[in-house]
UniProtKB/Swiss-Prot annotation:
GO cellular component, one term: cilium
Protein name, UniProt field: Platelet-derived growth factor receptor alpha
Keyword field contains Plastid: no
Record's function text: Tyrosine-protein kinase that acts as a cell-surface receptor for PDGFA, PDGFB and PDGFC and plays an essential role in the regulation of embryonic development, cell proliferation, survival and chemotaxis. Depending on the context, promotes or inhibits cell proliferation and cell migration. Plays an important role in the differentiation of bone marrow-derived mesenchymal stem cells. Required for normal skeleton development and cephalic closure during embryonic development.
Species of the source: Rattus norvegicus
């Protein structure tokens, strides 16, 4: 640049660019005009002069148009000249032509130079042809824009339209329409010589842009290993017109891969990602992203430094030394600073053993402070002596490993571990041994007090010197922190006190010991031995008392309850001992012969017996006799007497084991009940299972797991239990084995048991679709085993149990242990409900679970009985449902495979119920489900259960059953005959034409009795007024009649009202009573 040129530049800087002189800095164009019109198809040239090399910018490049030529001319002056020549000019050559200095132009700056605008009018082309990108007009929101529809003739009038609507806007033929336009398509129109010309659509698109770029740079990490992939992202928010450039070490190698992702929700976000795969150490350095807004000249950049290592590394820096101490019970923390990549694994060891993380006294913790920096802490909480040792921290990853070990000592105050009189010499000498511990190791000193009475005063103690005659002191170290000292006295003539003192920097420990002269020691030894013996005796007595109290006691399951609230929801147990016992039930012991044992338990047994004189029609009758073992306690005798009184209170019924008599005087208590020929229902079902399966082949034979049997070995099955000392089951009365008899009086007459005649009936309603032969119904309520066990037999058992429980409910009696093992089967397949707990070893029976001092049949109990100890008739209904499951699984154990534990209790609470057994119909299973309702009020009563099951049986079954029941009540069965005297008095003053009228009256009372138990809760009991012993028989009969009447009126029950036979006289009744002994004494005092 010459001197004149430099002067011009300086003048422009001082005076401003508006001066004419500054224009000299730009090149010159000839012709020197702002615009020029060139005829179509003509040629024109433009000449550019400048101080340095110059170039041209024009509407069409030389590559696109061969009609354009640019050349450089040489001249004698110092100026540079470039000529642009166009031949055969067309409308496409219309536009700006600019000459500029080459050295003033950069890629990012706009062209600065001299301009001239050339028009080439074309009558066939009013508008300059558009380029590929000219039809898209991008503008920032709410900013002005230019729609570049340019004309080839400056005098052409142009209009702008948007969807057919004229848009007012200012127009410049060299620029186009300028204004603020809404988004959408626009078309320019022009009319030349009567012809209308239209441009193609210009689409205006508004972009969102702000004055700030809001640039954010992020990288997942700043430290990498060789071979890993570097990923860096830059995000721009709320801007759509952004130009972003990356600068990074690998840029020159074009190693990076860039991507752009646009996210529009919830706000506009442009995410630029740079990925450098397989990084090397050369890729370490600064990574920069620079964003520039295309429309507002706003620029922002972010930088992050990334380091790439050949491999991973680990560095540790502990904040403590190799030897550390901690005071006893002190809280101490040891911190190690770690720098590592990749992420390290940190572990602590104590004496080469890994510390468990969940220790409460020693804890370890790792916290990440920065990308590659970590802090690991070892914390001792209330340090203990055993915390001393060598601690090691190990930090490692796949490429490197570092460790650091330090020794920790717990400083412990001195204390005395042991002070004993260790040795007695033959001449009266004694040695005292003192063991002390502490860290640092303590020193031991000895002190002596010769006046025992003044040893409480420290001034009476003197330090024992090591050089005293007849006294020897010595010390030995035992371990790191334990020391032992000994002092020996040649002779001790009187009692003295010796004190051992242990001292270290943290504290002092001391203990004292008395040395007794040998003459006094023997006296103390004798006193100590007597005291120890006394303590042993007292402890033994306490243990025996506890064991005796925890021993299970016999408890009768049947309970009579009485309501204490109007709705029956609250009740109390009636004390059975308050119930009266009528001496008419007394039976002479010499009229009873005892035989084989039928069942035996922890508290008593049931034996087979023969009774003489119980019934006029059967002078000799086979009976079952309940009795206690000889070792029974008074509480168990009282429980058996309570059972007797409850049975007398209940009265007779076909489907309970009826009381026949009792022996309560001059010996052990015997309760005489009916003899049940077939034993308990469980064993009966087991025994007849094969016959049932043969009649019902459609029922699959399963693996019998619920019976505990082995199906593969049929020869090992035993459905009849012959031994009762172990499980207490009732024996099969048909079993002909040799048993041990307990004779009291030998009689040779043959026992005869009255047989209840069976009845025929129709088939059940629920089986109407099946054809039932008469032979299939013959074995119901009969002993005919030719047909085997049938499904109708199971329904018959179900019905009879419901009727028996209905009777107990009418008497306010709660069974509490209703199960198939407590249901017996008599001749005629008559079901008898009983309480067989006396003759069952419940302590070894898996069906009973220990609860305190009693055993409970949990699997048969209702939830309110298990969890709330609440027993009502409705809880018996639940047990009845479990009994049905036993019957229709042919004697299976409820909840097969489930143990009675917390899981079992939780399942019952959550509503778990057993599935339908194999041999139950859907109607029968529906009964079970109703019985197992978790809400007691929604369970059916036994009255309704009887009706439901009755509908499943043949139509004539109920009539046959009622006839058998009525025949039973009309018979001279001992249970009926002994109650008839009271019931006959209820008919005093009432005249009947015949026995049938009386039966009809009784049947009406029976229906009332069944309805009285239908409430599902508790019927109020009449007041019990025991009969005075001195009243005669007639007075007692009148009282019993009144009581029965009151009970019938108040409870709606006529269970105690029976039929007086027409041929029966008072003399007959008296003769029956004469069989017993004197009734003046009701029971021995020892049982009350």
């Amino acid at each position: 640049m010459g001197t004149s040129q430099a002067f011009l530049v300086l003048s422009c800087l001082l005076t401003g660019p508006s001066l004419i002189v500054c224009q000299l800095l730009l090149p010159s164009i000839l012709p020197n005009e702002n615009e020029k019109i060139v005829p179509l198809s003509s040629s024109f040239s433009l000449r550019c002069f400048g101080e340095s090399e110059v170039s041209w910018q024009h509407p069409m490049s030389e590559e696109e148009d061969p009609n354009v030529e640019i050349r450089t001319e040489e001249n004698n002056s110092s100026l540079f000249v470039t000529v642009l020549e166009v031949v055969n000019a067309s409308a496409a050559h219309t536009g700006w032509y600019t000459c500029y200095y080459n050295h003033t132009q950069t890629e990012e700056s706009e062209i600065e130079g001299r301009h001239i605008y050339i028009y080439v009018p074309d009558p066939d082309m009013a508008f300059v042809p558009l380029g590929m990108t000219d039809s898209l007009v991008i503008v920032e929101e709410d900013d002005s824009a230019i729609i570049p529809c340019l004309t080839t003739d400056p005098d052409t009038e142009v209009t702008l339209h948007n969807n057919g609507r004229l848009v007012p806007a200012s127009y410049d033929s060299r620029q186009g329409f300028n204004g603020t336009f809404s988004v959408g398509p626009y078309i320019c129109e022009a009319t030349v010589r009567g012809r209308t010309f239209k441009t193609s659509e210009f689409n205006v698109y508004a972009l969102k842009a702000t004055s700030e770029l809001n640039l954010e740079m992020d990288t997942r990490q700043t430290v990498y290993k060789a071979g890993e992939t570097i990923v860096v992202t830059c995000a721009v928010f709320n801007n759509e017109v952004v130009d972003l450039q990356w600068t990074y070490p690998g840029e020159v190698r074009n190693k990076g891969i860039t991507m752009l992702e646009e996210i529009k929700l919830p706000s506009i976000k442009l995410v630029y990602t740079l990925t450098v795969p397989k990084a090397t150490v050369k890729d370490s350095g600064d990574y920069e992203c620079a964003a520039r807004q295309a429309t507002k000249e706003v620029k922002e950049m972010k930088t992050v430094t990334i380091s790439v290592h050949e491999k991973g590394f680990v560095q540790i820096r502990p904040t403590f030394g190799h030897l550390e101490t901690v005071n006893l019970h002190q809280v101490r923390e040891f911190v190690v600073e770690v720098q590592a990549y990749p992420t390290p694994r940190i572990s602590w060891l104590k004496d080469n053993l890994t510390l468990i993380e969940n220790l409460t006294e020693i804890t370890t913790d790792v916290q990440r402070s920065q990308e590659t920096r970590y802090q690991s802490k070892l914390k001792l909480i209330r340090a203990k002596e055993e915390d001393s040792g060598h601690y090691t921290i190990i930090v490692q990853n796949d490429d490197d490993m570092k460790s650091y070990t330090f020794e920790l000592s717990t400083l412990v105050p001195a204390s005395i571990l042991e002070l004993v009189d260790d040795h007695h010499g033959s001449g009266g000498g004694q040695t005292v041994r003192c063991t002390a511990e502490g860290t640092p190791l303590p020193n031991i000193e000895w002190m002596i007090c010769k006046d025992i009475k003044k040893c409480n005063n420290d001034t009476s103690w003197t330090v024992l010197a090591s050089n005293v005659s007849n006294i020897i002191t010595e010390f030995h170290q035992r371990g790191r922190s334990t020391v032992e000292g000994r002092v020996s006295f040649a002779k001790v003539e009187e009692t003295i006190a010796v004190r051992c003192l242990a001292k270290n920097d943290l504290g002092i420990g001391n203990r004292e010991l008395k040395l007794v002269a040998p003459s006094l020691r023997s006296e103390l030894t004798v006193a100590a031995a007597v005291l120890v013996l006394l303590v042993i005796v007292i402890v033994s007595l306490i243990v025996l008392v506890v064991i005796w109290k925890q021993k299970p006691r016999y408890e009768i399951r049947w309970r009579v309850i009485e309501s204490i609230s109007p709705d029956g929801h609250e009740y109390i147990y009636v004390d059975p001992m308050q119930l009266p016992y009528d001496s008419r039930w007394e039976f002479p012991r010499d009229g009873l012969v005892l035989g084989r044992i039928l069942g035996s338990g922890a508290f008593g047994k049931v034996v087979e017996g023969t009774a003489y004189g119980l019934s006029r029609s059967q002078p000799v009758m086979k009976v079952a006799v309940k009795m206690l073992k000889p070792t029974a306690r008074s509480s168990e005798k009282q429980a058996l007497m309570s059972e007797l009184k409850i049975m007398t209170h209940l009265g007779p019924h076909l489907n309970i084991v009826n009381l026949l008599g009792a022996c309560t005087k001059s010996g052990p208590i015997y309760i005489i009940t009916e003899y049940c020929f077939y034993g308990d229902l469980v064993n009966y079902l087991h025994k007849n299972r094969d016959s049932f399966m043969s009649r019902h082949p459609e029922k699959p034979k399963k693996d019998l797991d619920i019976f505990g049997l082995n199906p593969a070995d049929e020869s090992t099955r035993s459905y009849v239990i012959l031994s009762f000392e172990n499980n207490g089951d009732y024996v099969d009365m048909k079993q002909a084995d040799t048993t041990q008899y307990v004779p009291m009086l030998e009689r040779k007459e043959v026992s005869k048991y009255s047989d209840i005649q069976r009845s025929l009936y129709d088939r059940p309603a629920s089986y109407k679709k099946k054809s039932m032969l008469d032979s299939e119904a013959k074995n119901l309520l009969s002993d005919d085993d030719s047909e085997g066990l049938t499904l109708l037999d199971l329904l018959s058992f179900t019905y009879q149990v419901a009727r028996g429980m209905e009777f107990l409910a009418s008497k306010n009696c709660v069974h509490r242990d209703l199960a198939a093992r407590n249901v017996l089967l008599a001749q005629g397949k008559i079901v008898k409900i009983c309480d067989f707990g006396l003759a069952r070893d419940i302590m070894h029976d898996s069906n009973y679970v220990s609860k305190g001092s009693t055993f409970l049949p949990v699997k048969w109990m209702a939830p309110e009985s298990i969890f709330d100890n609440l027993y009502t008739t409705l809880s018996d209904v639940w047990s009845y449902g479990v009994l049905l499951w036993e019957i229709f699984s042919l004697g299976g154990t409820p909840y097969p495979g489930m143990m009675v534990d917390s899981t079992f209790y939780n399942k019952i609470k959550s509503g778990y119920r057993m599935a339908k057994p194999d041999h139950a119909t859907s109607e029968v299973y529906e009964i079970m489900v109703q019985c197992w309702n978790s809400e007691p009020e929604k369970r059916p009563s036994f009255y309704h259960l009887s009706e439901i099951v009755e509908n499943l049986l043949p139509g004539q079954y109920k009539k046959s059953y009622e006839k058998i029941h009525l025949d039973f009540l009309k018979s001279d069965h001992p249970a009926v005959a002994r109650m008839r005297v009271d019931s006959d008095n209820a008919y005093i003053g009432v005249t009947y034409k015949n026995e049938e009228d009386k039966l009809k009256e009784w049947e009406g009372g029976l229906d009332e009795q069944r309805l009285s138990a239908d409430s599902g809760y508790i019927i109020p009991l009449p007041d019990i007024d025991p009969v005075p012993e001195e009243e005669d028989l007639g007075k007692r009969n009148r009282h019993s009649s009144q009581t029965s009447e009151e009970s019938a009126i108040e409870t709606g029950s006529s269970s105690s009202t029976f039929i007086k036979r027409e041929d029966e006289t008072i003399e007959d009744i008296d003769m029956m009573d004469d069989i017993g002994i004197d009734s003046s004494d009701l029971v021995e005092d020892s049982f009350l």
